[in-house]
Amino acid sequence: MSSSSGSGGSGGGYIQTETDKYVAGVDEVARGTFIGPVIAACVVLPHIFPDDKYKQIKDSKKLSEKKRTELAEYIKTIAITYGVGSASVEEIDAINILNATMKAMHRAVDEAYKKHTFDKLLIDGIYFKGYTPPGLDSELLEYECIPKGDMSYLSIAAASIVAKDYHTNLINDMVAKHPELNLYEIKKNKGYGTPKHLAAINNYGITDFHRKTFGICKYK
């Protein structure tokens, strides 16, 4: 068994949280894409790990797709609890991306909390809309926003991995079912506004999967 109790870092210098509380890390992915839903994940890691593999957990952007998938499965196996939430393209267009991101985060928190309660949220970023999961008696679940938290807190890094792996699988499934999306190179760019994606929008217009209120999509 491997311990990472207290405030000491893991092998990668990441901070683990207090041993007397269950603290959840929360992160989102695809906030800036032109296509598909925004995804969030909430992860509570154990205070004692079954092995040293947790030391490989780090910001998902620094991992290959194959490694992210491997670590996402590991995280889901060892986590005290975890949840994934999303907000649809329709919700994004109706209430804007910030509010849709909050909905995705709240849904991820809900899914995790109903399986195992926890005491606090660590949110990647600078803003979070306070929230009370079903079953919590107090007014709001305690939370703290941490800029670039996926680079410093193990639980947030774990959430970033789970969210990004979920989003990758969603995009791959979407393209498999709707091969016309290959015109936009969605499997490669994951929905982000790369030059080839933008050129395809100019040439072919937008699909039902595009966010109608985003950038160039507003004019197509």
Residue positions per predicted region:
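RNase H-like, Mg2+-dependent phosphodiesterase core
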Residues: 1-220
